Amino acid sequence: MQLLNLGLLLLLPFVAGEIAPQPEPLRAGPSDIVPGQYIVTLKEGLASAQIREHKKWVSSVHQANLDSFAAGASGVETVGIMKNFHIHNLNMYSGGFDDKTAEDLRRSPDVKSVHPDQHVYLAKTVTQPQARWGLGYMSSKGMPVPLHSTLVDYLYDDKAGEGVWAYVLDTGINVDHIEFEDRGILGHNAIPNKPHTDEFEHGTYVAGIIAGKTYGVAKKANVVSAKAFDTGSSTYNYILETYDWIVKNITDSNRKNKAVINLSISGAKYQPFDDAVENAFKAGITAVVAAGNDGKDAKNNTPASSPNAITVGAVRWENTRPSLASNYGKIVDIWAPGELIKSCWKGGNNATSTQSGTSAASPHVAGLVAYLMSLENLPSPSAVTARVLNLTIPNLVKDAKDSPNRVVYNGIQERKFTLPKNTK
């Protein structure tokens, strides 16, 4: 049985000025599995005609099993194939199947894997007053900055992500928040019978760190809401649908070199979604992902373990891992601000909140990617990753454990760009 399924990362509250103790990570028990629902991954290299024939076969096998005694064994109502996903060379589908059909699928020569779908849980978020150190850290070469100071300068080129799109797979975004001006876009809502609004606040907070006019790293980037979570849970059925939509939208809009996906989500390793992130990379699309908040090696987390995503750990203002225990390990590519970070919030079009977690660290780096894309010709995700890592400042994190020890930096003090009169 796998551990907790992919969920939004914990944004931790503060109580009496201190970080609230983090609850033990949830473990996936039988109740986390969606009964009778599966994610099926097909083998690479199948022709379109083979895929069509496979799905016809699935429909016939499913119907035959429904008509048999075996179909009722699980006591679960089944519906057959539900949704189809195509990300670069990866073909997948979700479906509701009885136990016999699921076993038949596993034996099919066309099928790479059959995974039970799983519930995805949202972590609770509550509030702590103010902090503004994170942006100053981005341009300070990793030097410790005053925690509550509003005087820390954030230096950046005023192109600031202009002409770049940041896709936020999350709980939705309040695109009417004043921080987004006219740059917020409602993209895709995978949650049935729910409005395309942020009812949980996580997505709006993340988007504000990427592109808010006050709190954002890339203050002129567009943010696209891709809602895969509601106020309590989701499943990979919705997450894969949303990721599939994002990849298609980026591709169809000819934005591959001007788009970044932020995934402030984490859970136990789940290969179908890691495969989706990897195939989007092969298609030319950059993803930035959170390392997770379990205080463990991130190699066992999805999507942190996706080999070509940019995996982000969280640091405090004095270059230590937060007391909320950011994940670590060789899979962590970079460290970014992740404690006491102020950004947009729900509850009004000018609402703000201060939160902590690798959910906050990941959008700092996604914002940096958008910023660099607006300034430089970065022709591929590999070039983006190389540029981000080449700018990092080494050997500053005091407790990086087995992780590469490099913190985020936007390169402004070296005047890597032609910008003197455009610098803010």
UniProtKB/Swiss-Prot annotation:
SUPFAM superfamilies in the cross-refs: Subtilisin-like
UniProt-recorded name of the protein: Subtilisin-like protease 2
Residue ranges annotated as propeptide in the record: 18-123
Record-annotated active site: D170, H202, S359
Residue span, Peptidase S8 domain: 132-424
EC number: 3.4.21.-
Bilayer-crossing regions: none
Residues annotated as signal peptide: 1-17
Organism this protein belongs to: Arthroderma otae
